[in-house]
């Protein structure tokens, strides 16, 4: 905000300087053509006095405007700090979020919920049966991948469940005498 005021001040100074040059040029041109003494505009002292008065008025008005603007900014700052009492150092609380941790946490909780639902559905559907889920569920488990990189851990779990299923199926299908 201060840089905006600074740029505005520079702009005003440039405009004021260009006005002074143009007035000086017109004074020089008007002095080459003498005007009658009864004309008050032809008097160079009168022009300089009017010019100084207008410059002073403009500068005074602009200074008053800047002072009122600073006062408004200060009051706004005080109101903001009063609202945030303990969080004065935190400027943009609504934008603060640790995206990676939140995303990983959300995905983990979602996958845990899905796994719990699948397990309950399997228990309800598979009571009394001794076989394991169909091949489709195992293929889905192989394709599923966790966001935080625990793919290898899940792969080991799936492979262990496949090996256990094959072993139990082998135990159930073979006769006791064939096992020795």
Curated annotation (Swiss-Prot):
Residues 1-20 form the signal peptide. The modification Phosphoserine is found at residues 54, 105, 108, 150, 152. SMART domains: GLUCA. The modification Arginine amide is found at residue 127. Keywords: Amidation, Cleavage on pair of basic residues, Hormone, Phosphoprotein, Secreted, Signal. Induction: Glucagon release is stimulated by hypoglycemia and inhibited by hyperglycemia, insulin, and somatostatin. GLP-1 and GLP-2 are induced in response to nutrient ingestion. InterPro entries: Glucagon, Glucagon_GIP_secretin_VIP. It is found in: Secreted. It comes from the Eukaryota. The record marks 52-53, 83-84, 91-92, 97-98, 130-131, 145-146 as: Cleavage. Residues 25-35 have a biased composition (Polar residues). The keyword Signal applies. Glucagon is secreted in the A cells of the islets of Langerhans. GLP-1, GLP-2, oxyntomodulin and glicentin are secreted from enteroendocrine cells throughout the gastrointestinal tract. Residues 84-89, 131-145 form a propeptide. GO terms for molecular function: glucagon receptor binding; hormone activity; identical protein binding. GO terms for cellular component: cytoplasm; extracellular space; plasma membrane. Residues 25-59 are annotated as: Disordered. Proglucagon is post-translationally processed in a tissue-specific manner in pancreatic A cells and intestinal L cells. In pancreatic A cells, the major bioactive hormone is glucagon cleaved by PCSK2/PC2. In the intestinal L cells PCSK1/PC1 liberates GLP-1, GLP-2, glicentin and oxyntomodulin. GLP-1 is further N-terminally truncated by post-translational processing in the intestinal L cells resulting in GLP-1(7-37) GLP-1-(7-36)amide. The C-terminal amidation is neither important for the metabolism of GLP-1 nor for its effects on the endocrine pancreas. GO terms for biological process: adenylate cyclase-activating G protein-coupled receptor signaling pathway; adenylate cyclase-modulating G protein-coupled receptor signaling pathway; cellular response to glucagon stimulus; gluconeogenesis; glucose homeostasis; lactate biosynthetic process; lipid biosynthetic process; negative regulation of apoptotic process. The keyword Membrane does not apply. Pfam families: Hormone_2 (PF00123). Belongs to the glucagon family. This is Pro-glucagon. It comes from Bos taurus (Bovine).
């Amino acid at each position: 905000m201060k840089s905006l005021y600074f740029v505005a001040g520079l702009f005003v100074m440039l405009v004021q300087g260009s006005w002074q040059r143009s007035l000086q040029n017109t004074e020089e041109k008007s002095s080459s053509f003498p005007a009658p003494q009864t004309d008050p505009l032809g008097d160079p002292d009168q022009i300089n006095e009017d010019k100084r008065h207008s410059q002073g008025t403009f500068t005074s008005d602009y200074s008053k405007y800047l002072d009122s603007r600073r006062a408004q900014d200060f009051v706004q700052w005080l109101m903001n700090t009063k609202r945030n009492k303990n969080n004065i150092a935190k400027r943009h609380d609504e934008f603060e979020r640790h995206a990676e941790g939140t995303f990983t946490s959300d995905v983990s909780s979602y996958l845990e919920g899905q796994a719990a639902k699948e397990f309950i559905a399997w228990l309800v559907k598979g009571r009394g049966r001794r076989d394991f889920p169909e091949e489709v569920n195992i293929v889905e488990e192989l394709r599923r991948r966790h966001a935080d990189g625990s793919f290898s851990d899940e792969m080991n779990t799936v492979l262990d469940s496949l090996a256990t299923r094959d072993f139990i199926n082998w135990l159930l299908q073979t006769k006791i005498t064939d096992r020795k």
